[in-house]
Swiss-Prot record:
Reactions mediated catalytically: Hydrolysis of terminal (1->4)-linked alpha-D-glucose residues successively from non-reducing ends of the chains with release of beta-D-glucose
Species this protein is from: Clostridium sp. (strain G0005)
Name of this protein: Glucoamylase
Keywords: Carbohydrate metabolism, Cell membrane, Glycosidase, Hydrolase, Lipoprotein, Membrane, Palmitate, Polysaccharide degradation, Signal
EC class name: hydrolase
Lipid bilayer topology: Lipid-anchor
Signal peptide coordinates: 1-21
Length: 702
């Protein structure tokens, strides 16, 4: 497509590469900017994020390439740069037409299959076959280990007719710096390579192809973007080269030139950085780029414990997902998930999703690293937590990777978890900066918590009290190692006192379920037998506190605070199983609690603040850990978690009752993957590997 050039800018790039010494450096780039036809009728309609049902997630296993990608519905979904909490892309997908009679969107109109390059890498092959049997698109997706570039090699095949019967288009939806609105798009030619650029503030993206574009257009979402144009006209009729608003960048692939091609999306903090990365990545040998990406991940996996050869693909995939969830600037900041729950119904007002740091989730991730033998990663997470302790001695409910609070609830288990982790890692050097401030805060605020671990309601929670007792016991030991004997005595006395109060504060003997005796989810008053109503979040309703049960009470056993054969534990197990357990075709799982509203109302409705909570696979793992503590076999629960994983080896936050398949909740949920990683060797060794032994010895083995 011929275009008039109205701006010519020769650009000299002084830096030779992101990594010194890499090949195919570009020292001088000539940039011509097109600025002929701006899109009209902006700024475009409001957009959403992508589905949270991820088929894969990935990044280079190093601190140099700061790009993370996700896959959903057979296409690239959210991509993050330069930090793991900053999404810049909603989606990159293909659209197929015959130019006259049909339009086929690969994310809606194909059957998508995902394969890993190897069991020990986070590189993916997607095979999308048209539901009507007309075409197939095969894609390989990974990142450049030396640059801030996402690479996709694609192949289009005609299953009906010939390639010349089809037109292939690419749609790129930028959501730069967690915002879909008011992004700027424009077109340049750099060293004779046409690139679709997008920018917001100091973040730039450059989309390019090794065979160029047959045509392109930048339009406003649902006004005149490429998808709207194709729906109306079956081929590209709009040819805009700039727009500012809620934009979609579109391009036509010249199938006559080649049906197999490479697409590169590069990032930078300036236009020249993004353009340079794109040119350098395209100039590299594709197979070499792919091999380098695979080699980094395989080297990591081969460094992990393999448990005498028993380690399986889900174990390795879980460890890679956890490893990939660390920010590369703020080291040790492991987010909860590379997803936005129910993202296809969430807009710009949901900037955080689950790509934030929770102290609780990070604790479980660190325990997985310890179990797998990656103690360095666990230590980095603890060092990070020490940096986010606030002046009042507490860690926020969750934070951006910078440590800036996102939500502001106070959860005392999130204060205790880093103390337990410090004990497990023997990090007595963090006493003044982490352990003591958190322990003092727990004593000041507890045992009543502002929110329990489901982040919804305050009161006296058996799970939170288990964490408080375990945390203070560990804090007492660490205080002794630092010769702070006065604090050590204070912490241990408080732990002993609260351990004795757990039953009085959280165990009802007059409940309406089963025989009436069990640990309740949470007591709003310091009397679990009181007639006191609590409000269930997310539209769950209002109920007497004695009506609600939760598997979280098993933390009493997991953390060594109660014996697994304590009659009160056994009583509650029976009540929980009869009330909130479901046997799915893939294995058993549990609701967080009865009347939970955090989930889709139905399979045809997204969650928008009220619904029905579904089953949580991580609770299956927690039950397995209890069975091990009780001297039993956890294999059925381990297998259930394996069955809950999707084709890409990803475990979601929630699954459907009738199928055991993922809902549109967060996926992957790192907490669930961490649970699987710890359960796997615990079942082999017949021992709860993340139980703090000092707590167990004091309260159970005495």
């Amino acid at each position: 497509m011929s275009r008039k050039l109205i701006k010519y800018l020769p650009l000299l790039v002084l830096a030779s590469s992101v990594l010194s010494g890499c090949s195919n450096n570009v020292s001088s780039i000539k940039i011509d900017r097109f600025n002929n036809i701006s899109a009209v009728n902006g700024p475009g309609e409001e957009d959403t994020w992508a589905s949270a049902q991820k088929q894969g997630v990935g990044t280079a296993n190093n601190y140099v390439s700061k790009v993370w990608f996700t896959l959903a519905n057979g296409a690239i979904s959210e991509v993050y740069y330069p930090t793991i909490d900053t999404a810049d892309v909603k989606e990159i997908k293909f659209i197929v037409t015959d130019g006259k009679s049909f339009v086929s969107d690969e994310t809606k109109d194909t059957i998508s299959k995902v394969e890993k390059f190897t069991d020990k890498s986070l590189g993916y092959k997607l095979v999308n076959t048209d539901k009507k049997g007309r075409y197939r698109i095969t894609k390989e997706i990974f990142t450049d280990v030396k640059r801030n570039s996402l690479i996709m090699k694609a192949k289009f095949e005609a299953l009906e007719g010939s390639i010349h019967d089809y037109k292939l288009y690419l749609a790129y939806d930028p959501h730069i710096k967690n915002q879909g609105s008011y992004n700027e798009g424009y077109v340049i030619k750099a060293n004779n390579n046409e690139m679709l650029m997008a920018k917001r503030d100091n973040v730039y993206t450059a989309l390019s192809s090794n065979i160029g574009w047959k045509g392109y257009s930048i339009g406003y979402y649902k006004v005149n973007d490429i998808m709207t144009d194709l729906d109306e006209n079956k081929q590209m009729t709009k040819h805009y080269d700039s727009a500012r608003g809620n934009i979609i960048e579109g391009a036509e692939i010249d199938l006559k030139k080649n049906s197999q091609f490479e697409i590169v999306l590069s990032f930078g903090n300036s236009e020249d950085e993004a353009v340079k990365a794109s040119i350098e990545t395209l100039s590299e040998n594709y197979d070499s780029l792919k091999s380098a990406y695979i080699d980094e991940w395989e080297k990591y996996c081969n460094s992990l414990n393999n448990f005498n050869g028993k380690a399986n693909s889900l174990y390795y995939n879980s460890m890679m997902i956890l490893k990939a969830s660390e920010d590369k600037t703020n080291k040790g900041a492991y987010i909860a998930s590379l997803s936005i729950p129910w993202g296809d119904g969430q807009g710009d007002d949901n900037t955080g999703g689950y790509h934030l740091v929770w102290s609780r989730d990070l604790y479980h991730v660190a325990n997985a690293f310890i179990a797998a033998g990656d103690v360095d990663s666990a230590n980095r997470s603890l060092d990070y937590l020490a940096k986010v302790v606030k002046d009042n001695g507490m860690i926020p409910q969750n934070t951006w990777i910078s440590g800036k609070p996102y939500w502001t609830g106070i959860q005392l288990d999130e204060q205790a978890d880093p103390i337990i982790l410090s004990y497990r890692l023997r990090r007595y050097d963090l006493y003044d900066s982490l352990v003591k401030p958190l322990a003092d805060f727990i004593i000041k605020m507890g045992p009543k918590t502002g929110q329990e671990r489901w982040e919804e309601i305050g009161g006296y929670s058996p799970a939170t009290m288990a964490a408080e007792v375990a945390g203070l016991t560990c804090a007492a030991y660490i205080a002794e190692q630092n010769k702070d004997y006065e604090s050590a005595q204070k912490y241990q006395e408080k732990a002993d006192n609260w351990q004795k109060l757990i039953d009085n504060l959280t165990y009802t003997e007059h409940g309406p379920l089963e025989n009436g005796q069990y640990y309740i989810r949470i007591a709003g008053l310091p009397d679990p037998n009181a007639d006191f109503t609590i409000s269930i979040a997310n539209g769950g309703g209002v109920y007497d506190q004695k009506e609600i049960v939760d598997p979280s009470f098993l933390e009493l056993v997991r953390l060594g605070v109660k014996s697994p054969d304590d009659p009160k534990i056994l009583n509650t197990l029976r009540v929980v199983d009869s009330t909130i357990k479901v046997d799915t075709p893939k294995g058993p799982s549990w609701y967080r609690y009865n009347h939970d509203g955090y989930g889709e109302p139905s399979k045809t409705e997204l969650y928008h603040g009220a619904g029905k909570g579904r089953l949580w696979p991580l609770l299956t793992g927690e039950r397995g850990m209890y069975e091990i503590a009780a001297g039993k076999d956890a294999t059925p629960y381990l297998k259930a978690m394996e069955n809950f994983a999707n084709e890409g080896g990803i475990i979601s936050e929630q699954v459907w009752e009738d199928t055991g398949l993922p809902t549109d909740s967060a996926s992957p949920l790192n907490w669930a993957h961490a649970e699987y990683v710890v359960l796997f060797p615990s079942n082999i060794e017949h021992k709860v590997l993340d139980m703090p032994d000092i707590v167990y010895k004091r309260y159970v083995a005495k």
